Amino acid sequence: SKGSRHHLMLDDVFLYIQSHLTEDLSLERLENEFYVSHEHISREFKRQTGQTIHRYIVKARLDHCCSLIEQAIPLTEVYKMSGFGSYNHFFRAFKKEYGMTPSEYFKTTKKEARSS
């Protein structure tokens, strides 16, 4: 059916984003990858997930950063592996999402590790 084909496509989009998080993930790139207009991808994504594709990418990158920070990887390295274009962008997005800086987050992970 037509509906399930779009769902399948979205699963592919999720997988593609997850496996290319560290790269530049523009809508144009997704458009070329999936042979669908970026308007269509954006609309379908929002309709099925309730969030924008940009928001999903940012959140996926931040989740990835958190797991790297939890492994005690230096923040300068985390940022390079994050897919955010600049340290500033990474820093601001992180703080906005979690209400703390990446280094503050690192300190909380160390505390939790000691207390468990």
Q: Which positions does each model-derived feature cover?
A:
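N-terminal positioning helix adjacent to the helix-turn-helix/winged-helix DNA-binding module
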Residues: 2-13, 49, 53, 58-61, ...
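Basic/polar phosphate-binding segments, predominantly the helix-turn-helix DNA-binding elements
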Residues: 16-18, 24-60, 79-108
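Residue at a beta-strand N-cap/secondary-structure junction
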Residues: 24, 72-73
